[in-house]
């Protein structure tokens, strides 16, 4: 059987089990009887493509929460979030305040990093190479080159291959997802429409990506070559996507997720995990809502458990949502960064 005939989950499970076997052998003091295992370099090499792509895999099935301070970070960790994303303002407030949205204050990021044990991510403006270099120097676990912040470069994204820290990027369709992947992103998330509390755009983007992957699978090689040109990506990445029948990297859902039901819906549509922004901390019940969303994401296959999660919150305490149709074209964040 060829490697590309295995599913993503099968490959992931194999490497997890291989690591477990090595740990068991080491714990029982048997390495001296297995010289080949002793030769394996146990040093962690940061910055390699393998390491950068592996980190997001460990976030699969979990929820990353947007936060602006230490208190919110601690609530997220207590609720079971797999990571936090530090911003200067939550997306809802970015939308309301207008002006230029930039990277969060490094001092706040450091305070968050020292107060919790889960990974800490932070956002940079699209194309802002030096904001990314600062976050890399700061030691964050992942960088989000985000359309929520005001783009620094309207035409180009950061060349992420130059960094030792992994990046996540947003996408509305397969072309955007593969372009970001070819630039060195280690994770993709649907863009949705951040700061609205309206999950409809995240649903649309996830369905578009899934549909375009299905179309890719059924194409001839000649048509895939044409599609690679259309997407402006190397043919090999298109071919790999078709063969493994999914994006080559982890794909999370984001944009407008506000309730446990929203979380379960996006997981049901095929998301590997979730980013939840304003939906938690712009609600009136952030502690319970954070726990409920994490529970729903983890147990989305069991409606009875998601129902219990939904009962943990009050709809009357949910953030005030924004109808996408009421937004002017220039108010849409998702169109930033193609």
From Swiss-Prot:
Binding, D-ribose 5-phosphate: 66, 195, 256, 277-278
UniProt xrefs under InterPro entries: Aldolase_TIM (IPR013785), PdxS/SNZ (IPR001852), PdxS/SNZ_N (IPR033755), RibuloseP-bd_barrel (IPR011060)
Keywords in alphabetical order: Lyase, Pyridoxal phosphate, Schiff base
Superkingdom per UniProt: Archaea
Residues involved in D-glyceraldehyde 3-phosphate binding: 207
Record has Lyase as a keyword: yes
Lyase found in the keyword field: yes
Pathway(s) per entry: Cofactor biosynthesis; pyridoxal 5'-phosphate biosynthesis
Reactions mediated catalytically: aldehydo-D-ribose 5-phosphate + D-glyceraldehyde 3-phosphate + L-glutamine = pyridoxal 5'-phosphate + L-glutamate + phosphate + 3 H2O + H(+)
UniProt record, GO biological process: amino acid metabolic process; pyridoxal phosphate biosynthetic process; pyridoxine biosynthetic process
One example GO MF annotation: amine-lyase activity
Active-site residues annotated for this sequence: 123 (schiff-base intermediate with d-ribose 5-phosphate)
EC number(s) stated in the UniProt entry for this protein: 4.3.3.6
SUPFAM superfamilies, per the entry: Ribulose-phoshate binding barrel (SSF51366)
UniProt function note: Catalyzes the formation of pyridoxal 5'-phosphate from ribose 5-phosphate (RBP), glyceraldehyde 3-phosphate (G3P) and ammonia. The ammonia is provided by the PdxT subunit. Can also use ribulose 5-phosphate and dihydroxyacetone phosphate as substrates, resulting from enzyme-catalyzed isomerization of RBP and G3P, respectively.
The protein's assembly and partners: In the presence of PdxT, forms a dodecamer of heterodimers.
PANTHER family listed in its UniProt record: PYRIDOXAL 5'-PHOSPHATE SYNTHASE SUBUNIT SNZ1-RELATED (PTHR31829:SF0)
Family: Belongs to the PdxS/SNZ family.
The protein's name in its UniProt record: Pyridoxal 5'-phosphate synthase subunit PdxS
